[in-house]
A protein has these predicted regions:
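A short, surface-exposed alpha-helical micro-motif characterized by mixed small hydrophobic
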Residues: 109-111
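ABC ATPase "signature
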Residues: 127-128
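Conserved ABC ATPase signature
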Residues: 43-47, 51
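A short, proline-enriched helix->beta-strand linker immediately N-terminal to the Walker B motif
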Residues: 62-66
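Catalytic Walker B motif of ABC-type/P-loop ATPase nucleotide-binding domains
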Residues: 68-71
Length: 154
């Protein structure tokens, strides 16, 4: 029952005690950052899944969190929408936003991560830098996983 803009300004008004004008200005900036400024007056239920996800990211960024948690941010999206969400997350990475991302998008994780933790059946199998895990892993389960998702041998 709240517009896209209201979904972002409400946390600013209530959690950050920001006045309405400043909250609106910041919300518009965040919508520009996620490429949805033209959707400010629409209701989230009218947006695509990828657009809804980007509104959620803008809302999270509004309160300037130290860490943002993403749990499979692209898993339920149509393939055409995945890239738009990944672009927004990459932009956050470029801005040095700390994030914890649960993902199967391994090439994306390789692109933006400083550290990767590989889990199997909820147990940490290996953790380290991107280079350590993708190039020098001695963990058989991780190597098998990376080989299974690789398109190199098609």
């Amino acid at each position: 029952h709240r517009t896209v803009l209201e979904n972002i300004t409400d946390p600013l008004n209530y959690a950050k005690k920001m006045n309405k004008e400043d909250a609106k200005r910041k919300a518009v900036e965040l919508l520009q950052m996620v490429g949805l400024e033209e959707k400010a007056g629409q209701y989230p239920r009218k947006l695509s899944g990828g657009q809804q996800q980007r509104v959620g990211i803008a809302r999270a960024m509004a309160v300037e969190p130290k860490v943002i948690l993403f749990d499979e941010p692209t898993s339920s999206l149509d393939p055409e929408l995945v890239k738009a969400v990944l672009r927004v997350i990459k932009r956050l990475s470029d801005q040095k936003q700390t994030m914890v991302i649960v993902t199967h998008e391994m090439q994306f994780a390789k692109l933006i991560s400083d550290k990767i933790v590989f889990l199997d059946d909820a147990v940490i199998q290996e953790e380290g830098s991107t280079k350590e895990l993708f190039e020098n892993s001695e963990n058989v389960r991780l190597r098998n996983f990376l080989q299974a998702i690789s398109l190199d041998d098609l």
